[in-house]
Amino acid sequence: DIVIAERGGALKAPVAVKVHSGEVGNQNFIKLEFFAPTIEASGGIVTECNTAYDGGRNTTARHIKTLKKHGWSEFFDVDLLDAEGPDLELEIPDGKVIKKNYVGKNIVNYDSLLVLSHFKGHPMGGYGGALKQLSIGVASSFGKAYIHGAGVPEEIWTSDHDSFLESM
């Protein structure tokens, strides 16, 4: 109710509710119970994208297991936006470093995007939060590598740090 009341009306359905579902073994994510009332009030579908690094969310199969382990798919419908390709390429004509981004193609199935995020220190980006959720968060696995690599996905961990930040 808080989100809808603050906005002054309902979000246009269908609503994608972008969350960080949490990495396996990591406690630094907001738990489902905290977000549940807002998700229910929005009437939305929980959405996520696969990661570009090894772990419990780097493939669709592993990510589905993580979503189940953390309770997301038990209580809500979940859509992995990049579960199946091809990625959706979005142009960024005024981008300082990159001129396009690759996002999960299922994002076109939604008329509204509600971003639920936490604020944290991030080893590469300085701070993570809502803006990071809108760039890297909705990027496909390839898109995440593309952003981290400042347009060269193969340089995901070796690109110039400032170029990475400007890409995000």
Regions found by a protein language model. Give the residues of each.
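N-terminal and secondary-structure boundary signal
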Residues: 1-168
